[in-house]
Amino acid sequence: MTANPSELAERVAGVVGSDRFSSDNGTAKVRVDSDHWLEAHQTLGAEMPYFSWLSAIDWATEVAVGDPPESEDVESRYEILSCLGNVETGELVVLSTDIAKDEPSIASVAGVFGGANWHEREAAEMMGIDFVGHPNLTHLYLPDAFEGHPLRKTFALLSRDVKPWPGTVDVEPMPDEEAPSTENPEDAG
């Protein structure tokens, strides 16, 4: 039988030794210290053997997506999240932790959950996070010579260097067509 999310969050928090948990929007979420990230996954491995996903968020000045900063001293950080589940009971829990942006690294959970392998590789490639102990942090998407981490908020988009956002609408003709008129038909009189 599936526990309700708030009971599940409280139970999992007790198992991993955390006092920070919630069940917002029907999802059990437990915060763990980054030093205990691997240990939390090892502890939950038997109870929650299904690894669903891992992701990272670049929190710059927002407290939450779209929220204005509460003060000028908002801590810039990366949040790492993973979702574990039990397919027999239907339970899912999201574990999350914060890591510093100046040296973004955290223990790899790929040795506990094989499914975390590619998720960690993607986060390493796109966000520049070092998953310590990962067996193969090679690129998945980008060429090996690519410089930078495209999902970081500090990553400069070339298209925005060439044409500032939001830019103007360029009306270009299709090949073998005349350029569309930019005159107002009412002014043509």
Regions found by a protein language model. Give the residues of each.
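Terminal low-complexity/charged segments
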Residues: M1-G189
